[in-house]
Amino acid sequence: MSQSNSDDSASSSTQQAGDGQDDVQQNIVWHAHTVSREDRESKLGQRGVVVWFTGLSGCGKSTIANELDRLLIDRGATCTLLDGDNVRHGLCAPPSVLKEEHGEDFAGRFGLGFGPTDREENIRRIGAVTELFASAGVIVLAAFVSPYQRDRDRVRNTIESSGRAGDFLEVFVDTPLEICKQRDPKGLYQKAIAGEIKNFTGISDPYDAPPSPEIHLKWREGQTPHDQASEIIREMEKRGVLGPAKG
């Protein structure tokens, strides 16, 4: 996930909701749908699940997720891919991106940097989006550093509370930090080590390795993204969250 030093000082959490919305929760009720989740899954012929990739920057999350996306599409599945860098251009954009169009006040309230609270909100937003997709029967691939275990656990609870146990598959892309530093495709580690980027996971910010992920992809010399994506396919089939290929 790309990180920008200029965004670290801005945190939406420091702003108050305001605008007379403090009691809005009292006036919001859940509107039941006529079409159920089961109806949608039956129509698609699949189970809506979230495959959540986590790991250090440069570990291979996005590359493996893209390969898995292709394998799933090729076998007739309906899926979508949410990537950490891409959502920072819209849904979870930093203040610097929002400021020009929406103004400084809006950007300060809703733009997200990379401090602990902003990271928490980033994953909360993504978790809510993945829940919407999964409840529609879509297989969701989410590739995010998501460094804090508590935030990943909250997403898991959101997904499984609205669906079933087992609807959230945590994939730990376990690539050693030294290998990630060597890859450094965006030059971020070099900048972080030089002090040009703050709150960088693995350098100046911690990463909570998953203690018991559903899928643990340990780095092995010579293993390709296709090999790793195929391993995930096999595990999904084994767990009964992915049916046979269609067509």
UniProtKB/Swiss-Prot annotation:
Residues forming coiled coils: none
EC number(s) given by UniProt: 2.7.1.25
Reaction(s) catalysed by this chain's protein: adenosine 5'-phosphosulfate + ATP = 3'-phosphoadenylyl sulfate + ADP + H(+)
Gene3D superfamilies per record: P-loop containing nucleotide triphosphate hydrolases
InterPro entries membership: APS_kinase, P-loop_NTPase, Sulf_AdTrans/APS_kinase
Gene Ontology annotations of biological process type: hydrogen sulfide biosynthetic process; sulfate assimilation, phosphoadenylyl sulfate reduction by phosphoadenylyl-sulfate reductase (thioredoxin)
Keyword line: ATP-binding, Kinase, Nucleotide-binding, Phosphoprotein, Transferase
General function of this protein: Catalyzes the synthesis of activated sulfate.
Protein name stated in the entry: Adenylyl-sulfate kinase
Taxonomy of the source species: Bacteria, Pseudomonadati, Planctomycetota, Planctomycetia, Pirellulales
